[in-house]
From Swiss-Prot:
Disulfide bonds: none annotated. This is Zinc finger C2HC domain-containing protein 1B. Its cofactor is Zn(2+). It comes from the Eukaryota. GO terms for molecular function: zinc ion binding. Residues 48-78, 196-222 are annotated as: Disordered. Pfam families: zf-C2HC_2. PROSITE patterns: ZF_C2HC_C3H (PS52027). Keywords: Metal-binding, Repeat, Zinc, Zinc-finger. InterPro entries: ZC2HC1A/B-like, Znf_C2HC_C3H. It comes from Homo sapiens (Human). Zn(2+) binds at residues 18, 21, 33, 37.
Length: 222
């Protein structure tokens, strides 16, 4: 306030200008006005909306502006690569038709072309478009975690199996006791002696000839 030029108002009262708003106040009033005026001017004011002011006191709701959705960037089509793939496919088809007519073996197919718009997955190394790649990622990650090959762990399993087989030793063949062997021999002898007989016929165990019941084989008379 020292540098401010005083102003004599009516009644010979000196008024001093405010450094912020430029209005003039008495010395005692300016001391109270200064801090308040600085706070008001330093505060960020919201932008004034005349639409809200006009709609106040009415039943019309305020219209919220929908944010404009950003359109995804259009990818450049790789027409040159597609044209070359098309020409290679036609040439390969002509070579196959010519080989069939001449009876020669079919030529190898052209190498597969890589679509630059497809995304390669790090787990299976296959390529998908963007939407399919997002769906496939979790499934492929789960499958690859199940099929992790650990050479050290596999070698340890094989070694433990071989050691267990060596400790078991060779399989012993089943042995037949003497009592069981004698029983089997008796059954064989009984089976050979017992022959089914027909009406009135019997089998001679010595010669194997059939005899009538009640008669025995006699020697021929001289």
């Amino acid at each position: 306030m020292a540098g401010a030029e005083p102003f004599l108002a009516d009644g010979n009262q000196e008024l001093f200008p405010c450094e912020v708003c430029g209005r003039r106040f008495a010395a005692d009033v300016l001391e109270r006005h200064g801090p308040i005026c600085k706070k008001l001017f330093n505060r960020k004011r919201k932008p004034f909306s005349s639409l809200k002011q006009r709609l106040q006191g009415t039943d019309i709701p305020t219209v919220k502006k929908t944010p404009q959705s950003k359109s995804p960037p259009v990818r450049k089509s790789n027409w040159r690569q597609q044209h070359e793939d098309f020409i290679n496919a036609i040439r390969s088809a002509k070579q196959c038709m010519l080989a069939i007519k001449e009876g020669r073996p079919l030529p190898p197919p052209p190498p597969p072309s890589l679509n630059p718009d497809y995304i390669q997955r790090p787990y299976c190394m296959r390529r998908f478009n963007e939407s399919a790649a997002e769906r496939h990622t979790n499934f492929c990650k789960d499958q690859s975690s199940r099929r992790v090959f650990n050479p050290a762990q596999t070698a340890a399993k094989l070694a433990s199996r071989a050691q267990g087989r060596a400790q078991m030793g060779p399989k012993k063949e089943p042995t037949v006791t003497s009592a069981v062997g004698a029983l089997l021999q008796n059954r064989v002898l009984v089976a050979t002696n017992e022959v089914p007989t027909k009406s009135g016929l019997a089998m001679d165990p010595a010669s194997g000839a059939k005899l009538r019941q009640g008669f025995s084989k006699s020697s021929k008379k001289d």
